[in-house]
Amino acid sequence: MIRKLTMIQAITEAMDQKLAEDSRVMLLGEDVGVNGGVFRATEDLIHKYGANRVVDTPLSEAGIIGAAIGMAMNGLIPIVEIQFLAFIYPGFEQIVSHAARMRYRTRGQYH
């Protein structure tokens, strides 16, 4: 039988499952910790996995995505929450200008 979930419930459950199955998975974003995210998608995850894996960040989408790129380069598996679509654009610069070119900028040290 297929369970009926809201989109937020499905997202929360997926993040919970990934955090549970791999200690390298980290969740970061604005208000994802104690506040549980703007839509409560991360509610209670900080209590379950701790502040070292569910990380509240400053209000800086470029900083959040840049940090996630660095984490991924060093073996972690970051999940980033960007609260609203319009806020993704400042962070997208990190993906286009840094993550996409990292292999070539490091002579293949990072893929």
Stretches with model-predicted labels:
Residues 1-111:
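Thiamine diphosphate
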